[in-house]
């Protein structure tokens, strides 16, 4: 076979294909157009077949005919179609929930690759079954479609959740090239979430012991096996490369920094008509929620990302806002802080969004727009109450916590996330653990000044691109957090909040 001239088919596997959960959804969607331009009809995205797969359109194309035959021979049930994003990539949604005996599956992974799954719960078993089914699908398509044409196949797997798929491909069709990309390490995320500084003495950390102590041995074990067995191992930033080397036992072959395709993002750097109109809608909706009109000069700040209070810096953001509220008392300053952090909920809270001043949250102003699960124990709501961020009329800082996905149908703003973001005055993303950081990158791309940190992959990349003295003029502020205490970080962030609140219009 002439490898230089043979056609390459690329399979890309993620739990977030047509299923937005976190940042990997942005990773996949932002490069789909370029992948289609390069690989054409030889590019396939594989995701989970769920009750609801937003953006998926099942299609009856001639291109699927040969695939259906190959899948049928292995009794693999899939939905075949396109994803309504730029590039309209081909998508295979894989059914998996009734295909396997989980005990047998986990035993096979232990026997073949030494994966220790004993401590794994359903949040581990479900993605293992999904990824294994994806591995079978890739093997079936390679054997029925690619191999007869003397082509080559490469399969890319995102995160530990797809690690079992890589191991399955390696076992069934070892001639298929495999790539494993980790966007964070399970151990790094878990340790950082407890408040530990994982970077200062990383080389002294014993991964197996720490994984056991945090009850994540199963996830760490399959992640390590996937990194070890992959033909190529990549991660998204040098800082995560350090983690991977120590925690997973393999140095990445390539650092694949994340990006955004600016061709599909509107340029709002000069023409602000659309963000201005969105701002008007946000201000009206917020005023109704708060039972009082916000001043026109109100500064709108946003924080978003995974619901990880410490890792994403939500804790220091709320602390900094509370200090700002005290400092601004008696002034005409006004800050509206949008906490756009997705969490479990049962729908919009009709009383909260009614605008009726007689509707209250046990006598207090509402903070949250939706009915969150276990509200008395919700970390964001509790932190706001403890810090005095209670939305009383006299407060200079008002906060609105929206735990719903902003897909244009959230029941509160009913505006997509990117449009809400573009209408803000600044995005605050003061992360403690952030392997890359799509949220500040998206903020900058949508022409909104953004704050990130030197513990973020994007922050470190941005700092390398700019001269230190010119950073504040680029619209990206990289705040130091490495080696700093909680209070020191709050002090720094508080200064930035006050500075942003005092910025003149325009």
Positions of PLM-derived features:
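Catalytic cores of nucleotide-sugar-dependent glycosyltransferases that transfer UDP/GDP/TDP-activated
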Residues: 1-506
């Amino acid at each position: 076979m002439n490898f230089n001239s043979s056609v390459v088919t690329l399979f890309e596997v993620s739990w977030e294909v047509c299923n937005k959960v976190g940042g990997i959804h942005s990773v996949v969607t932002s490069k789909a157009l370029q992948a289609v331009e390069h690989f054409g009809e030889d590019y396939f995205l594989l995701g989970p077949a769920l009750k609801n797969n937003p953006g998926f359109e099942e299609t009856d194309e001639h291109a699927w005919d040969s695939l259906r035959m190959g899948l049928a021979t292995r009794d693999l049930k899939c939905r075949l179609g396109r994803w309504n994003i730029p590039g309209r990539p081909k998508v295979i949604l894989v059914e998996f929930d009734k295909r396997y005996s989980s005990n047998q599956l986990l035993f096979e992974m232990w026997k073949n690759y030494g994966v220790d799954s004993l401590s794994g719960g359903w949040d581990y078993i479900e993605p293992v079954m999904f990824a294994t089914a994806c591995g079978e699908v890739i093997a079936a398509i390679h054997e029925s479609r690619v191999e007869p044409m003397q082509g080559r196949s490469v399969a890319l797997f995102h995160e530990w959740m797809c690690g079992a798929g890589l191991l399955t491909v390696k076992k069934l069709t070892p001639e298929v090239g495999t790539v494993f990309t980790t966007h964070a390490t399970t151990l790094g995320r878990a340790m950082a979430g407890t408040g530990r500084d994982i970077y200062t003495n990383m080389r002294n950390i014993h991964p197996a012991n720490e994984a056991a102590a945090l009850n994540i041995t199963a996830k760490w074990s399959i992640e390590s096996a996937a990194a070890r067995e992959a033909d190529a191992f990549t991660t998204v930033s040098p800082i995560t490369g350090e983690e991977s080397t120590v925690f997973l036992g393999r140095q990445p072959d390539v650092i694949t920094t994340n990006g955004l395709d600016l061709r599909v993002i509107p340029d709002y750097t000069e023409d602000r008509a659309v963000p201005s109109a969105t701002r008007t809608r946000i201000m009206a909706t917020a005023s109704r929620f708060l039972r009082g009109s916000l001043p026109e000069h109100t500064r709108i700040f946003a924080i978003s990302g995974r619901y990880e209070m410490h890792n994403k810096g939500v804790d220091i953001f709320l602390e900094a806002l509370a200090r700002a509220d005290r400092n601004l008392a008696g002034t005409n300053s006004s800050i509206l802080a949008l906490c756009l952090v997705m969490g479990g909920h049962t729908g919009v809270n009709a009383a909260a969004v009614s605008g009726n001043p007689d509707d209250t949250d046990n006598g207090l102003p509402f903070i949250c727009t939706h009915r969150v699960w276990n509200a008395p124990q919700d970390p964001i709501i509790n932190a706001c109450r403890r810090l005095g961020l209670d939305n009383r009329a006299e407060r200079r800082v008002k906060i609105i916590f929206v735990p719903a996905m902003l897909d244009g149908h959230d029941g509160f703003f009913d505006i997509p996330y990117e449009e809400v973001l573009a209408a803000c005055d600044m995005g605050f993303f003061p992360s403690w653990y952030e392997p890359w950081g799509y949220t500040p990158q998206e903020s900058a791309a949508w022409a909104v000044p953004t704050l990130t940190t030197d513990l973020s992959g994007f922050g470190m990349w941005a700092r390398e691109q700019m001269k230190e003295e010119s950073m504040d003029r680029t619209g990206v502020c990289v705040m130091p957090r490495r080696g700093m205490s909680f209070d020191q970080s709050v002090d720094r962030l508080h200064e930035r909040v006050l500075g942003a609140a005092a910025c003149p219009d325009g």
